[in-house]
Amino acid sequence: MSSGTPYIGSKISLISKAQIRYEGILYTIDTENSTVALAKVRSFGTEDRPTDRPAPPREEVYEYIIFRGSDIKDITVCEPPKASHALPQDPAIVQSSLGSAPSASYQSSVPYSPFRGMPTYSQLAASSLLSQQYAASLGLAGFPSIPLRKSPMVEQAVQTGPLESQAQKKVQQAKGAPVNQRGIRQSGPQSQPAPLNVPPAAAPVLGTVNDENRRPPRRRSGNRRTRNRSRGQNRPTTVKENAIKFEGDFDFETANAQFNREELDKEFKDKLNFKDEKPEKEGEEKTDSGVETQNSDGNPEEDPLGPNIYYDRSKSFFDNISSEMKSRRTTWAEERKLNTETFGVSGRFLRGRSFRGGFRGGRGSATPRRNQTTQRAGTGRV
């Protein structure tokens, strides 16, 4: 490109080394930093050019993009600069700007000085191209999320200003409608702030700011705690006042010293009304085996062991510990009647078996069946 041609303001088609084509209006050319700035840029993708990473075209129009000169493959002028209805060359005019923001970017196409009245690309954040109204009308809030940095020569994407200034504007707009602590709007004339042209995507954000200002902070913290808790944790916990507290370890020696076995045996016999039927003899102790117990035949059982001797291997295999169960022993007829009253009439009866015989037959009935199966398997009979 020759230096005599006024390319500023013309429509440029630029192809990067990543084979992505961009179209935009030439804004500035920085020879010191070797950068080219385009305004109103649109990406057309790779367009079937050979590349390892193909990119589809995008419909978004970016406010400006600054390209690195070393990463530009080809530049083509598509359209000459549009004729602008500028003011006559009056030496009294130092600088002028039109009412609309887009027309201010084409003031640089004055033939006598293309760079007069035009700020450099480093001052674009304060220029009319990045004004709040123009950025809101194009919806530039969503541009930082566009993955344009796949191309290595894109140095800087569209910026909408620092976040702190935007947050201050939102807070000021939220404070524009004063509200009492009780939630009642104040009556009378109120000064309304100047309306901001905010895109629809930013409208819910302002609504949440107003809601947060109206809610007390304690209520929000309480709601936040209740979300993380389950229903059972919200209920007040009751502490038992009559909890048993143990001061030290249990002393077994002291407990054994207080434990008298003979006195407990006497109390136990008195409660059960034990009767001693055997006569006492001279020089012999009174036996404890005179408890009347009846079996199924009605004959009393005698204790084969001596007094206070609960198990003697030489006399009998059985012990004398379960004497309480002997006094409460019932016949098979009584137990069958009790089972019928409790569980009802069963579908299968034990034919001709007493309680003890039926019990042994129930447990031992599987043994002859296994023996019969073994004999059949051994003899080969089916």
From Swiss-Prot:
Renumbered ranges of motif FDF: 300-302
Region (Disordered): 164-243, 270-310, 354-382
Biased composition (Polar residues): 368-382
Chain span(s) of sequence motif FFD box: 309-325
Keyword Ribonucleoprotein belongs to the record: yes
Keywords assigned by UniProt, alphabetized: Developmental protein, Ribonucleoprotein, Translation regulation
GO biological-process terms attached to the record: regulation of translation
Sequence ranges of Basic residues compositional bias: 216-232
Residue ranges, compositional bias (Low complexity): 166-177
Residue ranges constituting the Sm domain according to the UniProt record: 1-81
PROSITE patterns: DFDF, FFD, SM, TFG
Bilayer-spanning residue ranges: none
Signal sequence coordinates: none
Molecular function terms, GO-annotated: RNA binding
Sequence ranges of Basic and acidic residues compositional bias: 270-289
InterPro entries xref list: DFDF, FDF_dom, FFD_box, Lsm14-like_N, LSM_dom_sf, Sm, TFG_box
All residue ranges annotated as the DFDF domain in the record: 238-274
Cellular-component GO terms for this entry: ribonucleoprotein complex
Motif TFG box per UniProt: ranges: 327-347
Family: Belongs to the LSM14 family.
Role according to the record: May be involved in the storage of translationally inactive mRNAs and protect them from degradation. Plays a role in control of mRNA translation.
Quaternary structure annotation from Swiss-Prot or TrEMBL: Component of a ribonucleoprotein (RNP) complex, at least composed of cpeb1, lsm14b/rap55b, ddx6/Xp54, ybx2/frgy2, pat1/P100, eif4enif1/4E-T and eif4e1b. Different translationally-repressed mRNP complexes probably exist that contain either lsm14a/rap55a or lsm14b/rap55b depending on the developmental stage. Component of a ribonucleoprotein (RNP) complex, composed at least of elavl1/elrA and/or elavl2/elrB, igf2bp3/vg1RBP, ddx6/Xp54, ybx2/frgy2, lsm14b/rap55b and, in a subset of RNP complexes, stau1/staufen.
Protein name in the entry: Protein LSM14 homolog B
Gene: lsm14b
